[in-house]
């Protein structure tokens, strides 16, 4: 008796670019054999706005408001790296107080970034409730940003060459401490809701596993790299700003799956709270109201009027010329390594301004880890990468 052989023709399916689980205008051309993913081709570029070319036709001060439109969840990180590049090329010193203020803003942005990743990721795998909780927490961070910069989500326009645009307002540090005290139990609440939830764990454990060597070879960074057993964090490696002043640990895991990436980001929020608390206590000059009172009482010769107690080294003129030379500078954002390659030619605008977006590099491994998985796993694996298409397409 002859046995009939079942044959299935491969089917090509388009996910996106308008699918709600695509996290922006990403299109995936997926080849399926039944429910198994045979191949996947990401199609990007739908959100290309020519950011690098815009940067090459603007002065640094003019370009800073643009950059938060690339990644609306990491606006402060892009502002920081865009001012760090000309600072290093022109050897402009940054006062200690300004560096602490920058760290406060960056760590608040890291928490906000991870929260905005957490809600949609859980919604992708079927847990709807935490999606509403994360916006409650982000609202507190928005309030802190609004008090310091005047804007909430994007377009903060706060970082400047040599420091920041303005000192912290009165009472800001106390409000930041209140946020830390309020948010710490909320992370425990997330852990109770999610981490040991058997449905959630069965859904994502062992999914989208990336080996250590693959993570390095594909040039992954951030939680994608650290979840695969590589404790690499640019805050420890490059010693930029004043991160060496604080006591904190790099969050990393060995498994390399979606669950490991989730755990890394949860732990990073805890570490960011540790850094925020220490920065609030250790900032040179203390709260702005105390610093201003000390300057007023002690006069011009006051220690509080010294360089390290300023919020900016020297306000850079609109005619500031980027010196001849080239350099690459980078920092650790919530998604990984973001960097700028800057080439100056002694002009007010740069000759070349190349932006390295972390999620752009991290997205490249998606076809490699999707093969062999089920079609229902595509959303969970893509969600664990943390992609925002504004910075991928630039």
From Swiss-Prot:
What family is it from? Answer: Belongs to the complex I 49 kDa subunit family.
Q: Which domain of life is it from?
A: Bacteria
Q: What gene name does this entry carry?
A: ndhH
Check the record and name the InterPro entries matching this protein: NADH_Q_OxRdtase_suD, NADH_UbQ_OxRdtase_49kDa_CS, NDH1_su_D/H, NiFe-Hase_large
Q: What is its EC number?
A: 7.1.1.-
Give the keywords, sorted.
Answer: Membrane, NAD, NADP, Plastoquinone, Quinone, Thylakoid, Translocase, Transport
What taxonomic lineage is listed for the species of origin?
A: Bacteria, Bacillati, Cyanobacteriota, Cyanophyceae, Synechococcales
User: Which coarse location class describes where this protein primarily resides?
Assistant: membrane
GO BP term (any one): photosynthesis, light reaction
Q: What are the subcellular locations of this protein?
A: Cellular thylakoid membrane
Q: List the GO cellular component terms.
A: plasma membrane-derived thylakoid membrane
Cite the NCBIfam families for this sequence. PRK06075.1 (NF004739), PRK07415.1 (NF005649)
| Matches recorded under HAMAP family | NDH1_NuoD (MF_01358)
**Source species:** Synechococcus sp. (strain CC9902)
Catalysis: reaction(s): a plastoquinone + NADH + (n+1) H(+)(in) = a plastoquinol + NAD(+) + n H(+)(out); a plastoquinone + NADPH + (n+1) H(+)(in) = a plastoquinol + NADP(+) + n H(+)(out)
Instruction: Return the broad EC class.
Output: translocase
* The protein's name in its UniProt record: NAD(P)H-quinone oxidoreductase subunit H
Q: What is annotated about its quaternary structure and interactions? A: NDH-1 can be composed of about 15 different subunits; different subcomplexes with different compositions have been identified which probably have different functions.
Q: Which GO terms describe its molecular function?
A: NAD binding; oxidoreductase activity, acting on NAD(P)H, quinone or similar compound as acceptor; quinone binding
Q: How does it sit in the membrane?
A: Peripheral membrane protein
């Amino acid at each position: 008796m002859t046995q009939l052989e079942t044959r299935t023709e491969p089917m090509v399916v388009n996910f996106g670019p308008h699918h709600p689980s695509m996290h922006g205008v990403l299109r995936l051309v997926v080849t399926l054999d039944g429910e198994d993913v045979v191949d996947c081709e990401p199609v990007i570029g739908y959100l290309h706005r020519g950011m690098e070319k815009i940067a090459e036709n603007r002065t640094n001060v003019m370009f800073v408001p643009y950059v938060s439109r690339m990644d609306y969840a990491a606006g402060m990180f892009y502002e920081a790296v865009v001012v760090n590049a000309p600072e290093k090329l022109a050897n402009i010193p940054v006062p200690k107080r300004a560096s602490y203020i920058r760290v406060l803003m960056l760590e608040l942005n890291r928490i906000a970034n991870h929260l905005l990743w957490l809600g949609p990721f859980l919604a992708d795998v079927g847990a709807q409730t935490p999606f509403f909780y994360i916006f409650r927490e982000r609202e507190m961070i928005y309030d802190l940003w609004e008090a310091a910069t005047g804007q909430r989500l994007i377009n903060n326009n706060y970082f400047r060459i040599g420091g920041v645009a303005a000192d912290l307002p009165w009472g800001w540090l106390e409000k930041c401490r209140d946020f830390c005290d309020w948010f710490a139990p909320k992370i425990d609440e997330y852990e109770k809701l999610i981490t040991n939830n058997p449905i959630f764990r069965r859904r994502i454990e062992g999914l989208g596993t990336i080996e250590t060597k693959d993570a390095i070879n594909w040039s992954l960074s951030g939680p994608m790299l650290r979840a695969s057993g590589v404790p690499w964090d640019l805050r420890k490696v490059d010693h930029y700003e004043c991160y060496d002043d604080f006591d904190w640990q790099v969050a990393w895991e060995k498994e390399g799956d979606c669950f490991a990436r989730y755990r890394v980001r949860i732990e990073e929020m805890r570490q960011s709270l540790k850094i925020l608390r220490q920065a609030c206590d250790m900032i040179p000059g203390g709260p702005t109201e105390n610093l201003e009172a000390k300057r007023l009482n002690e006069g011009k010769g006051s220690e509080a009027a010294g360089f390290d107690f300023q919020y900016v080294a020297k306000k850079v003129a609109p005619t500031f010329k980027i010196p001849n030379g080239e350099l690459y500078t980078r920092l650790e954002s919530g998604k990984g390594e973001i960097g700028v390659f800057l080439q100056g030619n002694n002009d007010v605008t740069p000759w070349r301004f190349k932006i390295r977006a972390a999620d752009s590099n991290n997205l490249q491994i998606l076809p490699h880890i999707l093969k062999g998985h089920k079609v229902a796993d595509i959303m969970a694996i893509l969600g664990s990468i943390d992609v925002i298409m504004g910075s991928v397409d630039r």
